[in-house]
Amino acid sequence: ALTDDQGAEFRNRSIGFVFQFHHLLPEFTAVENVMMPLLIGRHDREEAYEVASKILGEVGLSDRLDHKPGELSGGEQQRVAVARALVRRPLVVLADEPSGNLDRGKNGQALLDMIWDLSRTLRLAFVVVTHDEEIGRRADRMVRLIDGHLVELNQEVTV
């Protein structure tokens, strides 16, 4: 078993998290928010800035690096949250209703399109939790939680 510190380091290094609400720190800029996992992982500040800037460019926010969350739209805030989840190049990203805080139209769809594109280009697994069947159908694999069991195509999935 891992100690609490080892578990925290493992999560920070290997798992990215995207929540329904972005959970950005309001007093920090977009690039500073994305730098956080790197700084916590004891990366050099200059290197962290460079890596965070690059990943923000990958999510279409290279012109918004120095904006604080309150100066960003909801869709931009959520893209910063996705960039933060990706900044350490994790093995997997867990996304809990990532578009749930956005309108179902253009912004929500654009975020989901970006997640699917990033999954393919970075060859990275995203585990997306959603109540929206339409979103689930876009996934490579869909499982349901029924009575406490994960079920896929009428077969129980081993986790």
Regions found by a protein language model. Give the residues of each.
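ABC family nucleotide-binding domain
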Residues: 1-138, 142-146
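Conserved beta-strand-loop-alpha-helix hinge in the C-terminal portion
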Residues: 109, 149-159
